[in-house]
């Protein structure tokens, strides 16, 4: 079932609810930069077969969510939107444990939510989380983006990561030709995503305490595996696990071995439920 969750007069989040009878738990999915919920159909189906209900939504500025396309005013909007989705899901499913899965920028959103709201979920799963400054904005380029993104917020910047998302050519081709994928975003958006939000994480990373599974492809060219390793080493969680996948690129859930990875995620969720 697809519908819209109204946040305010200017923003309504498009979401999909794929629920099973008597779910063992619920998983809320935060997709990555430029993505939309349609790219997680196979993930949803896999979780449903394992007895897990799934809620996913197009992040602000993305997909078919009703908001300015490719733009946000502040990274804090991602945290507040995510919180509204969590409250909505919990109100609809009283007493059912809730987990959150975030990929790439969605992993950043998930991590920030975990820092800001440490008591709402049973645990989180992060896939290639973009929680630190990435190669395109290191050094002088980051300084330029910081200035341009602050002073000329509405200038558009092209999505330059398209060829590096996955080692499966069909996935890359589908991504490039997907009308719901963002192929550009504003400088203001990129500043909030690539600079301001990672600064928030760096400042508050030790406050993150959720049980967490972090998964990362060793050949990730978009978010280097060192970023995931840094997060794992610096969060305050006692219950944490890091899995590195040799030969996999950024979108591990679109690589050919994705069923095995999803099985691992399901097993981890069920393990948390037994504790």
Name each region found by the language model.
Residues 224-233:
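Short alpha-helix in the alpha/beta-hydrolase fold that links the catalytic acid
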Residues 208, 214-216, 220:
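Short beta-strand/loop motif that positions the catalytic acidic residue
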Residues 39, 44-68:
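Conserved alpha/beta-hydrolase
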Residues 103-186:
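Alpha/beta-hydrolase-fold enzymes
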Residues 24, 31-35:
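Active-site glycine-rich loops that stabilize anionic/oxyanionic intermediates
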Residues 34-37, 63-93:
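Catalytic nucleophile-loop/oxyanion-hole region of alpha/beta-hydrolase
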Residues 1-20:
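N-terminal cap/lid segment of alpha/beta-hydrolase-fold proteins
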Residues 241-275:
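Catalytic active-site module of serine/aspartate enzymes centered on a nucleophile-bearing elbow/loop
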């Amino acid at each position: 079932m697809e519908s819209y969750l109204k946040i305010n007069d200017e923003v309504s989040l498009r979401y999909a609810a794929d629920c099973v009878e008597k779910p063992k738990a619920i998983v809320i999915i935060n997709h990555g930069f430029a993505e939309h919920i349609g790219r997680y159909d196979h993930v949803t189906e896999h979780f449903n077969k394992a007895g897990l209900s799934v809620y996913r939504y197009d992040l602000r500025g993305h997909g078919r969510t009703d908001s300015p396309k490719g733009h946000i005013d502040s990274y804090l909007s991602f945290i507040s939107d995510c919180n509204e989705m969590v409250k909505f899901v919990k109100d609809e499913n009283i007493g059912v444990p809730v987990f959150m899965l975030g990929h790439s920028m969605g992993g950043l959103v998930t991590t920030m939510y975990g820092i800001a709201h440490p008591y709402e979920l049973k645990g989180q799963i992060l896939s290639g989380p973009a929680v630190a400054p990435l190669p395109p904005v290191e050094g002088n380029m980051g300084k330029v983006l910081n200035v341009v993104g602050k002073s000329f917020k509405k200038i558009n910047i092209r999505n330059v990561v398209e060829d590096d998302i996955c080692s499966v050519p069909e996935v890359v081709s589908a991504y490039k030709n997907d009308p719901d994928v963002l192929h550009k975003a504003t400088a203001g958006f990129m500043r909030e995503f690539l600079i301001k939000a990672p600064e928030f994480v760096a400042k508050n990373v030790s406050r993150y305490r959720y049980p967490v599974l972090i998964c990362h492809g060793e050949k990730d060219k978009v978010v280097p595996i060192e970023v995931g390793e840094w997060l794992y080493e610096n969060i305050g969680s006692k219950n944490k696990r890091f899995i590195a996948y040799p030969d996999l690129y950024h979108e591990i859930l679109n690589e050919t071995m994705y069923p095995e990875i999803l099985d691992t995620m399901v097993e981890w969720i069920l393990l948390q439920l037994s504790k």
